[in-house]
Amino acid sequence: MERQGEVRISQCMIVKDEEENIRKALSWGKGIVWEQIVVDTGSRDRTVQIAESMGAKVYHYTWSDDFSAAKNYAISKARGEWIAFLDADETFAPGDGEKLPGILRQLESTKAEGIAAGWMQLDEEGRVSAAGTQIRIFRNRANLGYRRRIHEQLGRMDGTPMHIADATGELSILHSGYRGAAWEEKKVNGRNLNLILKELEDHPGDYEMMGYLGDEYYAAGDLDKAESWYRES
């Protein structure tokens, strides 16, 4: 039974082989969100079974080398008023998830379409190795969605700026994905590099993406190519 004044939040994520993370990723939303939507892009482990056992709505999506396409598919399945789109290797800082409904209630009558939250990258010892802001909570509206195959950007489909509320002092997202075996696998199979190259084929004037390409070559130890792309960007 829906409670009066309840803010309906759809927690969304896209996953593949995330059995080590999916339980924690879904746990923060229990008792907070209205529905949990998991879009699986081809898991070979127990990700789907675990998500289903926790009550999530699981959908299957054929991977098309495009993170934005998969995320927009997940959004299309959401029925809540707001969407919280965190990755499977992300969660809110302790106690922050519980603040979310109250923050959204305060924004209900405003023009805010999205919320800027703090974002922290954790190393293998759980220490903060990088920090910034991310827009992961936004209204469920047809004119909002993601673009780019990788390093996705949320925005209005017509390209005009979103109205963003600042909640960086109240909400922080913790990310643990760029470390350990999972990160080494991404580097070895070149997934990120290949997707960036495809994105630049489609959008050769994307200077920000050129910078990301420089980052990939730098991480791979190819300093000459890294410098070349940094200069281009």
What are these regions (language model features)?
Residues 3-11, 80:
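Mobile, glycine- and charge-enriched loop segments
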Residues 7, 68-75, 92-228:
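Catalytic-site signature of metal-activated, phosphate-bearing donor transferases
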Residues 13-35:
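Short, well-formed alpha-helical segments that are part of the catalytic scaffolds
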Residues 23, 62, 80:
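Active-site-proximal cofactor/substrate-binding loop regions of enzyme domains
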Residues 28, 40-52, 63, 87:
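A conserved acidic beta->alpha catalytic loop
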Residues 34, 48-73, 77:
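Conserved donor nucleotide-binding strand/loop of the catalytic core
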Residues 83:
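Short aromatic/hydrophobic "clamp" motif used to bind/position activated sugar donors
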